[in-house]
Amino acid sequence: MVRRRGPTPPPSPPREERPIVPQPAIDLEEGEGQVQPPAPVRLEIIGVGEEEEIVELEELVQGGVDDEVAGGEEVEGGEEEAEAPILGPQERRVRGVAAGERGELADRLDPEVPGPQPGPLLRDASGWSDIDQLGAWQCALNPFTTMESVPGPLKSKWARVMEIVLRAILTAPDEIRLTRALKWFLILPQAFLRQSKRGGQVGRSSVAGRFNAAMDGDFGTVIRLLMADRQKDEETRRREAGRTRRQKSEEEIKEGQRKLALSHLQKGEISKAVSRLTSFGMASIDDPVVMAALKSKYVARGKELPESVIMGQAVDFLGGLKETFASLPTGVSPGTGGLRAEYLTCLAEVWEDGTMAILEEFSMLYISGNLPPWWYRVWGCVTTVPLYKTVEMATVRPVGIKNPLIRTLHSRVIRDNRAALTAVLEPQQLALSLAGGHKLVHQVRMMMEEHRDWVVVKLDVRNAHNEVWRSAIIKALEADPTTQHLAWFAAVILAACSGLETGGKMWGEQGDGETQGDPKAPAFFAMAIQAIVRILDAELRAGGGKARFGNDDGYCGGPPEVVFPALARFETKLREECGLVLQRDKTEVFAWGELPEITPPELKRAGVMVQGRTI
């Protein structure tokens, strides 16, 4: 802030704006791929008693010009006392736990999510507070398709807008302004980078116009344009609701798959191309049968979480996010809100290390559980996609998608703690082990070939990741001294029920379980069942056998008279302590000869018999 002091001037009007040179809409075809310098921020002269202040845009958005004028108090020397940020700096930066320190979960289980501000809006000059007309869920749920990447000429402006919002979060002096800034963070992708309904120059200019308004300090126009597009989108949906859509032919579906696969191949994304070609397609949530199947996959909370959890720091620091963002995979679904990985890569391209530190600080607040409880409920909302399991299209499996920033942060937590987690899980659980899949295959095969009189049972746990009790995850992390520092991170992320949405519409909640595709899910699931797996392994080893798991895929080998009783006890403990159900009708038994007489009748034989041999 720049101050101009001097003799007492005559009374002046409350505010006088300096003239602004209007910026023309940017033609995205010109300078494509180039990073343009950020547009100059708007300055305003504000009369405050005996002096005038030149206020930058960042200060204006901290709650509006009126707050800026009236919010400060004069202290000795005539300077205003800066209001302390409500979030404050992080107190602990080193992984570990503080002796005897526990965090309460009561206010995190069902936090009240901020809604639209009731009554007339208190508008400010920048329009920053216009977002008060929207609730947090309205900001998070995105009915639009966002652009695949940030257009070259707009990269610096996207980075600038993101920086303004993050600074507003970190410096917010009260709950009202913190909530306002967090809602801006939620709505940024759809507010600025939603695809225009019109193509060509008109469409490109409309996108550029949103950024130009923000660079002119006019965030109110950004909200106004968004609300107008939302209204048009709703009207279009209502008109099309009663229409019968033409069903695509099988050849049209295959042609679409080939085009998508080819686009991935052109980018060098071979695995994505293969998955497109082998996919059986996506089911429609408008089909009542599909929706019923989808809802059955997400369960209500089966066991209450503990009242308090050991406080700990999951990671030491988050330095290096810039390099991580620069190498994020492209073409990945953005999840709830429309924030694509390409938008984060843009930040890595534009921001200097000092600016990236702002996002690192925000991310540390998230991981440490220092953001408002409602934030974890809203930001952690899961986009659900029902995919057909087979070519018959008779059954579906749900795929849950979280936004790429959450996935990146959760991946960092697991990466930094992989050694500690692996030490707890091995040798029974190989999900996090180096070349764990190879180790699992070789150990099971060697066990089968070495002991021709044994049986090997392949376990099938129903809907494992979606049904495991969250309380079991937290309990397991707290139980081991080497993983206690992760318990608080798990608790704040999992305390509130997770929202489930598709196409910007909420359709349900998930009270227990993890999200498949979330980088923390395999590790947390493995920890939840590890104590029971150890008991199973110990019972089998008493008879010479062993138990080995690759996450929820388990294999038990040993003499039949040892394996089957141990399996029954494992099944009971799994249900009582983790809320998981062993599907006996899908659990298979391998034996070189005939199945032993003591084999439970509901367990089926693995493999097939050909000329007296099992293959």
Which role does the model predict for each range below?
Residues 6-12, 21:
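Phospho-regulated RS/SR low-complexity segments
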Residues 15, 21, 27-31, 41, ...:
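Surface-exposed loop/turn segments and immediately adjacent short secondary-structure elements
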Residues 248, 307, 311-528:
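Conserved pre-catalytic core of RNA-dependent polymerases
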Residues 354-369, 440-448, 563-579, 602-611:
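Inter-domain linker/hinge segments that demarcate the starts of reverse transcriptase
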Residues 375-377, 546-549, 581-584:
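Short beta-strand
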Residues 413-429, 523-566:
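Active-site palm subdomain of RNA-directed nucleic acid polymerases
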Residues 463-481, 547-577, 592-595:
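Catalytic palm subdomain of template-directed nucleic-acid polymerases
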Residues 583-614:
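Short, conserved micro-motifs composed of acidic
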